[in-house]
């Protein structure tokens, strides 16, 4: 899959570093996800009043909505250290044991993509989360014996885009489950304005709204689009970001007013023009546009469904009447019979 301007995953190391500079450090600075903020504030204050580690927290939802940011905020609000790792990087039980053994009382351990840890590693997590201990097997064969090592109380914050892929025993060990949803226009506009202030760029209110509109409900994409519009403004408009420059830049980037790019259009057109709007199987669509099935399912499909452009049925994927309207394709009802 080629890098997309509307990809809600981080693209490269440079973008990782730049995003870190934009992240808030306190709940009061965090924009959006209001119910989550309110609940977390109560849970954190209660844990501090009892002088206990915060219950383990599971953050789930689409990429780019602030799960890593929230994990860091939790650590800041608790005034403790945070250790950051990811599911794929914990290959063996010993890797996890080493990380857990390095934690101090109250620390936060953040595991991104926690759904990707192996079942063998998961087994080590169970007693660590439940009883704050490690069960280590020493020796081999008949001489093998289990040794229990006590751990200081800690908070595990797990993040995933695929909560359904977590095993039930692991999921049930999280005391706090928080789902992050796509952002509304008001909160996204606030984020674009704040980022513009950080970058010290001049931008009008219409441009803020236009960038927010095309950001797929995702702060990471909003910030990325602002950076690219800033590039166009710097080269072609003396650094001024007005609505004319913004519209021109976003159109050149092939991001429409639904936040769809050329690949989204390609998917919808394949369903409509080649398969009469569906239903059509995901494998068939993948072959038609030259993408992998898992990429379609995880990256492209969720937003198209969320925008009401695509339906997932038992017989396959179906383009909705809204997809026809958006692409200016005549909708003939007989096609669907």
From Swiss-Prot:
Its EC number is 3.6.4.-. ATP binds at residues 22-23, 64, 67-69, 130-132, 173, 183, 220. DNA binds at residues 293, 312, 317. Gene3D superfamilies: 1.10.8.60, P-loop containing nucleotide triphosphate hydrolases, Winged helix-like DNA-binding domain superfamily/Winged helix DNA-binding domain. Keywords: ATP-binding, Cytoplasm, DNA damage, DNA recombination, DNA repair, DNA-binding, Hydrolase, Nucleotide-binding. GO terms for cellular component: cytoplasm; Holliday junction resolvase complex. It is found in: Cytoplasm. It comes from the Bacteria. The keyword GTP-binding does not apply. Mg(2+) binds at residue 68. GO terms for biological process: DNA recombination; DNA repair. Its main location: cytoplasm. It catalyses: ATP + H2O = ADP + phosphate + H(+). NCBIfam families: PRK00080.1, ruvB. Homohexamer. Forms an RuvA(8)-RuvB(12)-Holliday junction (HJ) complex. HJ DNA is sandwiched between 2 RuvA tetramers; dsDNA enters through RuvA and exits via RuvB. An RuvB hexamer assembles on each DNA strand where it exits the tetramer. Each RuvB hexamer is contacted by two RuvA subunits (via domain III) on 2 adjacent RuvB subunits; this complex drives branch migration. In the full resolvosome a probable DNA-RuvA(4)-RuvB(12)-RuvC(2) complex forms which resolves the HJ. Has 3 domains, the large (RuvB-L) and small ATPase (RuvB-S) domains and the C-terminal head (RuvB-H) domain. The head domain binds DNA, while the ATPase domains jointly bind ATP, ADP or are empty depending on the state of the subunit in the translocation cycle. During a single DNA translocation step the structure of each domain remains the same, but their relative positions change. Belongs to the RuvB family. The RuvA-RuvB-RuvC complex processes Holliday junction (HJ) DNA during genetic recombination and DNA repair, while the RuvA-RuvB complex plays an important role in the rescue of blocked DNA replication forks via replication fork reversal (RFR). RuvA specifically binds to HJ cruciform DNA, conferring on it an open structure. The RuvB hexamer acts as an ATP-dependent pump, pulling dsDNA into and through the RuvAB complex. RuvB forms 2 homohexamers on either side of HJ DNA bound by 1 or 2 RuvA tetramers; 4 subunits per hexamer contact DNA at a time. HAMAP family: DNA_HJ_migration_RuvB. This is Holliday junction branch migration complex subunit RuvB.
């Amino acid at each position: 899959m080629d890098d997309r301007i509307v990809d809600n995953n981080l693209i490269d190391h440079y973008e990782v570093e730049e995003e870190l500079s934009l992240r808030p450090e306190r709940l009061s600075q965090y924009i959006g996800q209001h119910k989550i903020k309110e609940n977390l504030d109560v849970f954190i204050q209660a844990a501090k009043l009892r002088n206990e580690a915060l219950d383990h927290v599971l953050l789930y939802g689409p990429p780019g909505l602030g799960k890593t940011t929230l994990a860091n905020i939790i650590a800041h609000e608790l005034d403790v250290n945070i250790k950051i790792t990811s599911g794929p990087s914990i290959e063996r039980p010993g890797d996890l044991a080493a990380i857990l053994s390095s934690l101090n009382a109250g620390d936060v351990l953040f595991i991104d993509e926690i759904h990707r840890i192996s079942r063998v590693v998961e087994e080590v997590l169970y007693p660590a989360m439940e009883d704050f201990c490690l069960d280590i097997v020493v020796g081999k064969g008949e001489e093998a014996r289990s040794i229990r090592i006590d751990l200081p109380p800690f908070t595990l914050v797990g993040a995933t885009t695929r909560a359904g892929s977590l095993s039930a025993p692991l999921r049930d060990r999280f005391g706090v489950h928080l789902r992050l949803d796509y952002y509304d226009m008001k909160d996204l506009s606030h984020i674009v304005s704040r980022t513009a202030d950080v970058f010290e760029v001049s931008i009008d209110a219409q441009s803020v709204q236009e960038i927010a509109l095309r950001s797929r409900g995702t702060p990471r994409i909003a910030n990325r689009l602002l950076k690219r519009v800033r590039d166009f403004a710097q080269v072609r408009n003396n650094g001024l970001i007005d609505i004319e420059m913004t519209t021109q830049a976003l159109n050149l980037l092939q991001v429409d007013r639904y936040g769809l790019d050329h690949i989204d259009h390609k998917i919808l057109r394949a369903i409509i023009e080649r398969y009469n709007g569906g239903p059509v199987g995901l494998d068939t669509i993948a072959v038609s546009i030259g993408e992998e099935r898992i990429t379609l399912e995880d990256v492209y499909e969720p937003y198209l469904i969320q925008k009401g452009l695509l339906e997932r049925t038992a017989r396959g994927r179906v383009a909705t009447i809204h997809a026809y309207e958006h692409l200016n394709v005549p909708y003939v009802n007989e096609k669907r019979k």
